[in-house]
Amino acid sequence: MGILFAALLAMTNPHLATGQIHWGNLSKIGVVGTGSASYKVMTQSSHQSLVIKLMPNITAIDNCTKTEIMEYKRLLGTVLKPIREALNAITKNIKPIQSSTTSRRHKRFAGVVLAGAALGVATAAQITAGIALHQSMMNSQAIESLKASLETTNQAIEEIRQAGQEMVLAVQGVQDYINNELVPAMGQLSCEIVGQKLGLKLLRYYTEILSLFGPSLRDPVSAELSIQALSYALGGDINKILEKLGYSGSDLLAILESKGIKAKITYVDIESYFIVLSIAYPSLSEIKGVIVHRLESVSYNIGSQEWYTTVPRYVATQGYLISNFDDTPCAFTPEGTICSQNAIYPMSPLLQECFRGSTRSCARTLVLGSIGNRFILSKGNLIGNCASILCKCYTTGSIISQDPDKILTYIAADQCPVVEVGGVTIQVGSREYSDAVYLHEIDLGPPISLEKLDVGTNLWNAVTKLEKAKDLLDSSDLILENIKGVSVTNTGYILVGVGLIAVVGILIITCCCKKRRTDNKVSTMVLNPGLRPDLTGTSKSYVRSL
């Protein structure tokens, strides 16, 4: 039943079937969609420990490399000591909280507390990172066990399993070079050359370590490292590292492209020269029904002015709902849009009307200089503002002109198979749009200003008008106050006086009218004295009546 309803809905409303964005009307004002993708959000990460062993095992060539090793240790100390001091400043001021139950007087772990008075100044990010750092740190027994294991291994990648804990992966970026190149060549090379070769390799490795952890010297507690950045310190074989860490699945490529695998420094040992990292591997959760659309705008001309429609770069749709989309925490991959946090937030009703096809709700702004797209390829057709850019049919060599009553030109294969626009030659396909958009056919939206200077000027004008309106309101309030101050008696006297004047005026007008009527009758009798009726043979009573 639900499937049947959806099919009927799609047939009766085709725009609803393909989404709530009215691409047909938007294309008339130069807005086209350039792509759509699913929406995935990173959820809670799983953590695993990774150890970077900075000092290789040189037992086989120890006699030839003492000088180079001493210099290498000195260089490592310049990087490791500041990081160790910053980590200790946070971790030594974080204490576990223990609570006692009311029924049984035994203590149990309840959380951690930060000694803010001893720490002094710390940002919210540093405090949060410090708490997470404390929770992911190894205990002293695990550290000592790790040291013993690292001293005996001579492998580039070693899986170290500790009692009661998960596997720890230890990596040494120079060990393969020592095992596979220097040790076999000990019989052919002099001791001095072996030392020089190792010194150059260690110096290069130190440079990679410095470029990786150098930015962390400023704030090693909250600094995060991507797995791509770690690849050099891990010997360059990132695929082998990911395999050892157990990272696989269909989302691995998407997570790598979005740089979702992060590492944070949790421990630094300046005696044994190793760094412990906590690797966070997120899982992806696809939000069903949400589609992220990417938009582009093409400028159009109204007379001599060039405009473009102001719309967001990305929007999201889910059913009938259209929302804004913040692409800042997101990465766009072939598998979809991957965000580290929710990037959808509400859109104003007016802008939603714009996307649903009401072009009068779409704001527009002037194009400044040469900024803005003047052509774009959509559905194989070229949508161009040929009033602002030269459009030429490459096939015939003729110029494609745009009449003043047109705002955009749509070029397809039936008009010109190969088009040259803006110095670019494009082969277009069959027609998907009308040949042009006429100005009288479009209800354009209100003009707005986006430049800081224009916005400031418009704001100053608005403030000036508000000040003038305020002055007028103050004047009207003053007049109203004066009217309220007049007493009721004075008002009554004024009304009585006005009434008497009106009555006297009416009487004077009435008398004047009567006098004028009498004067008219007298003048009529004087002007016709000879007109007398013939009364011969008429009775006296009739004459008297006359």
Curated annotation (Swiss-Prot):
Q: Kindly list the biological process annotations in GO that this record carries.
A: fusion of virus membrane with host plasma membrane; symbiont entry into host cell
The membrane topology of this protein is: Single-pass type I membrane protein; Single-pass membrane protein
List residues in topological domain: Cytoplasmic.
513-546
A GO CC annotation recorded here is: membrane
The entry annotates sugar attachment on N25, N57, N63
Q: Where in the cell is it found?
A: Virion membrane; Host cell membrane
Signal sequence span is: 1-19
Q: Which Gene3D superfamilies match?
A: 1.10.287.2480, 6.10.10.110, Head and neck region of the ectodomain of NDV fusion glycoprotein, Newcastle disease virus like domain
Q: List the disulfide bonds.
A: C330-C339, C354-C362, C386-C391, C393-C416
- Region: Fusion peptide; residue ranges are 109-133
Which UniProt keywords are listed?
A: Cleavage on pair of basic residues, Coiled coil, Disulfide bond, Fusion of virus membrane with host cell membrane, Fusion of virus membrane with host membrane, Glycoprotein, Host cell membrane, Host membrane, Membrane, Signal, Transmembrane, Transmembrane helix, Viral envelope protein, Viral penetration into host cytoplasm, Virion, Virus entry into host cell
PTM: The inactive precursor F0 is glycosylated and proteolytically cleaved into F1 and F2 to be functionally active. The cleavage is mediated by cellular proteases during the transport and maturation of the polypeptide.
Q: Which residues lie on this side of the membrane: Extracellular?
A: 20-491
Segments spanning the bilayer are 492-512
Site (Cleavage) at R108, F109
Coiled coil region boundaries: 134-162, 458-483
InterPro entries named among the record's database cross-references? Fusion_F0_Paramyxovir (IPR000776)
Query: This protein's superkingdom?
Result: Viruses
Question: Would you identify the family this protein belongs to, as annotated?
Answer: Belongs to the paramyxoviruses fusion glycoprotein family.
Explain the purpose of this protein.
Answer: Class I viral fusion protein. Under the current model, the protein has at least 3 conformational states: pre-fusion native state, pre-hairpin intermediate state, and post-fusion hairpin state. During viral and plasma cell membrane fusion, the heptad repeat (HR) regions assume a trimer-of-hairpins structure, positioning the fusion peptide in close proximity to the C-terminal region of the ectodomain. The formation of this structure appears to drive apposition and subsequent fusion of viral and plasma cell membranes.
The subunit field of the Swiss-Prot or TrEMBL record says: Homotrimer of disulfide-linked F1-F2.
What is the protein's given name? Fusion glycoprotein F0
Organism (species) = Rinderpest virus (strain L)
> Upper lineage ranks?
Viruses, Riboviria, Orthornavirae, Negarnaviricota, Haploviricotina
Q: Quote the gene name from the UniProt entry.
A: F
